[in-house]
Design a protein with these regions (language model features):
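A short SAM/SAH-binding and catalytic strip from SAM-dependent methyltransferases
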Residues: 114-126
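A short glycine-rich, Lys/Arg-flanked "PGG" loop and its adjoining helix->strand segment in the class I
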Residues: 128-140
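C-terminal alpha-helical "lid/dimerization" subdomain adjacent to the S-adenosyl-L-methionine
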Residues: 14-24, 143-201
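A generic alpha-to-beta junction signature in SAM-dependent methyltransferases
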Residues: 38-40, 63-64, 89, 138
C-alpha cells in the first residue's frame, strides 16, 4: 500500500497511471476552492507546478480565456496524462506541458503572471530555495498560490508522512515564513476550517 501511495509524489508504472487519474477527480473540490483566490486577468500567462493529471491546467485555461497555461511535472507519466487531458488546448497553442524540476525552473526571469501549486509543495525539497525559483520567473506584481488539502494542524494527517517518503505537511504560518524569506510580499493565509484546507497566496514585489 505504501508503494502505491508513493505515486502521489512521483507517479510511475501502472500505479502511477491510476494515481494521476485519481488526482484529477480526487483533488477537484479543494482545487476549485483554491482557484477562488486567484487574480482575475483574462489574458494571464500561468504556470501550474506539479501539474499531475492536468485537470487544473484545464480549469486555469477556462479561468483565463485569453491566456496561456504551462504545466510542469517531474513525472513522465503525469506529463503524458496532462498532455492528453489538454490536447485540444495544446493544438490551439494555448497550453504546453513539460517535464522538469521545481528546483531549476526552465523559464526566463519575470515570465509568468500567475503560478499555482496544488497539492504538491509537500514533496518539494529545499522549500525556501525553490520558492526563490518561483519568485524569479514571476513578473513583478505577479502572484503565487499554494493550495493544500491539509492545513498542517490535524495530527491525524501526519500519518501520511510516515507512509509517503519525502512528504512534509506545512502549516500556513510555516509557508508564510518561508515565502517571506524567499522575497515574497503580501502573503495571506486562507483556510476552510471545516475541511482543514489551506491556501496561501503571495506576490512578487513591484519593480
Amino acid at each position: 500500500m505504501a508503494g502505491f501511495f508513493a505515486n502521489t509524489r512521483k507517479p510511475e508504472g501502472w500505479g502511477g497511471k491510476l494515481m494521476v487519474s485519481m488526482m484529477n477527480w480526487g483533488h477537484a473540490p479543494v482545487a476549485r476552492w483554491g482557484r477562488s483566490f486567484l487574480q482575475r486577468k483574462t489574458d494571464a500567462r500561468v504556470l501550474d507546478l506539479g501539474c499531475g493529471g492536468g485537470a487544473n491546467l484545464a480549469a486555469l485555461l477556462k479561468l483565463y480565456p485569453n491566456g496561456v497555461a504551462v504545466g510542469l511535472d517531474y513525472s513522465a507519466i503525469s506529463v503524458d496524462k496532462a498532455s492528453a487531458f489538454n490536447r485540444r488546448a495544446i493544438a490551439q497553442g494555448r497550453c504546453r506541458v513539460i517535464q522538469g524540476d521545481v528546483r531549476g525552473l526552465p523559464f526566463k526571469d519575470n515570465f509568468f503572471d500567475q503560478i499555482t501549486a496544488f497539492e504538491t509543495v509537500y514533496f518539494w525539497p529545499d522549500l525556501e530555495d525553490t520558492f526563490r525559483q518561483v519568485l524569479r520567473v514571476l513578473k513583478p506584481g505577479g502572484s503565487f498560490l499554494i493550495c493544500n488539502e491539509s492545513d498542517g494542524r490535524d495530527p491525524k494527517q501526519e500519518r501520511w508522512c510516515g507512509i509517503i517518503g519525502g512528504m512534509t505537511i506545512y502549516t500556513g504560518e510555516q509557508l508564510t515564513a518561508l515565502l517571506r524569506a524567499a522575497g515574497f510580499v503580501q502573503v495571506e493565509i486562507h483556510r476552510k476550517e471545516r475541511r482543514k484546507w489551506l491556501c496561501v497566496t503571495a506576490h512578487k514585489p513591484e519593480m
